[in-house]
């Protein structure tokens, strides 16, 4: 399963986020937010692939939100609300040029996700 391998690699890279503490420079902020984004993207795509392989036809055209909800129903994940919060953070990556948004994403990644 290529998507699962990609997720594992992204997750291992994301662990580096704990090596950094504030104050962050711009490059560090951008890089840490990028690690979160890459890991989240690979996680929902791996879930999608697993759901498809398990016979969930609706997963074939599902959005990340739909995949998360289906994964929860399939007991693939335990905390639907936390995953949906992570999706909101991923959607906020587009606004990570705002330092406060970037810091929120980094904090949530370290403390919640």
What residue spans do the PLM features occupy?
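Solvent-exposed interaction patches of small proteins and small membrane subunits
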Residues: 1-113
């Amino acid at each position: 399963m290529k998507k699962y391998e990609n997720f594992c690699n992204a997750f291992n890279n994301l662990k580096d986020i704990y090596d950094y503490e504030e104050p962050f420079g711009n490059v560090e902020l951008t890089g840490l937010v990028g690690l979160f984004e890459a890991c989240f993207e690979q996680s929902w795509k791996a879930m999608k692939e697993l759901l498809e392989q398990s016979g969930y036809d609706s997963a074939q055209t599902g959005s990340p939100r739909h995949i998360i909800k289906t994964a929860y129903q399939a007991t693939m994940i335990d905390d639907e609300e936390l995953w949906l919060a992570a999706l909101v953070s991923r959607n906020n990556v587009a606004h990570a040029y705002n330092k406060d948004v970037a810091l929120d994403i980094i904090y949530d990644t370290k403390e919640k996700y």
